[in-house]
Amino acid sequence: MASTDKPGGDPEYRTSSTPAPAGVDYFKFDVILRFLLFAASLVAVVVIVTANQTEVIRVPQPVPWPAKFRYSPAFVYFVAALSVTGLYSIITTLASLLASNKPALKTKLLLYFILWDALILGIIASATGTAGGVAYLGLKGNRHVVGWNKICHVYDKFCRHVGASIAVALFGSVVTVLLIWLSAYSIHSRVPK
């Protein structure tokens, strides 16, 4: 009886001498996005740190009353989180530049980037949400709680700085989402089909 098997064995289990596909190289876009993340972090920190304004408030006597980011723990956390994000983006930009010359490191580095980018995204999102909540209270106040009055009609420059800083941080979080997507897609394109 003749065998119907091919001489090479089952093609599913045959080892191939061809290397796995290299995938499309998106490291140039990765470096650009990481630089944008650094720029967004830096701008957001500089804008909120320079958000100082002093106004004369009329209580029984006119008293100068300053508004600074240091007076709110939410804004301090915002500055700390975006400073960490800026440092992280510098380190990962340099790692991307170094790995672009070494193809063997790219896939492994992409996996680490996905994990760390997701962590940084959580930090940016929590800091932006916290600062946004306090900024909203400054803009609208809360008439149900004594002492939580609107302040943005008095401290207009301070509120504009805080709002601009939060908007730039939101842009940074979108950039981080794009970095995660780009790393995941790069890994997916390297998987043999």
Curated annotation (Swiss-Prot):
It comes from the Eukaryota. Keywords: Cell membrane, Glycoprotein, Membrane, Transmembrane, Transmembrane helix. It is a multi-pass membrane protein. This is CASP-like protein 1D2. Residues 1-30, 95-108, 183-193 are cytoplasmic. PANTHER family: CASP-LIKE PROTEIN 1U1. Its main location: membrane. Belongs to the Casparian strip membrane proteins (CASP) family. GO terms for cellular component: plasma membrane. Glycans are attached at residue 52. The keyword Membrane applies.
